[in-house]
């Protein structure tokens, strides 16, 4: 169980491995968290990474216009050299997904994964 330095353990330490993709399935997520992560990747990657974010609780709670527009804005912004691709999508049909998974991969093959209660917020 990870109790301390959760962001460092899940989002940054795996960058030292041979990975180039991060798949995030989160019940809840915010553009603020995604923006924070993008900014904090500065000089931390060995090669550009691809980030795929799937927000799961939208069928249950919906998504506010401001949050949706925040994700759109981030996807339209110019990406830093540390990020090759950024995708954000929502589950919109029931059942909602409350899982929180962080999967690091190399060219589509899983390398390391974390599951737990930490949303991407």
Where are these regions (language model features)?
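PLD/PLD-like phosphodiesterase catalytic module centered on the HKD motif
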Residues: 1-121
């Amino acid at each position: 169980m990870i109790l301390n330095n959760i962001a460092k353990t899940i989002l940054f330490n795996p960058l030292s491995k041979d990975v180039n993709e991060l798949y995030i399935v989160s019940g809840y997520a915010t553009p603020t968290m995604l923006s924070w992560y993008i900014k904090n990747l500065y000089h931390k990657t060995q090669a550009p990474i691809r980030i795929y974010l799937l927000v799961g609780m939208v069928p249950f709670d919906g998504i506010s216009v401001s949050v949706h527009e925040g994700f759109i804005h981030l996807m339209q912004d110019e990406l830093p050299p540390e990020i090759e691709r950024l995708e954000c999508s929502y589950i919109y049909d029931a059942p909602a997904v409350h899982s929180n998974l962080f999967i690091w991969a190399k060219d589509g093959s899983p390398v390391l994964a974390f599951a737990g209660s930490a949303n991407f917020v």
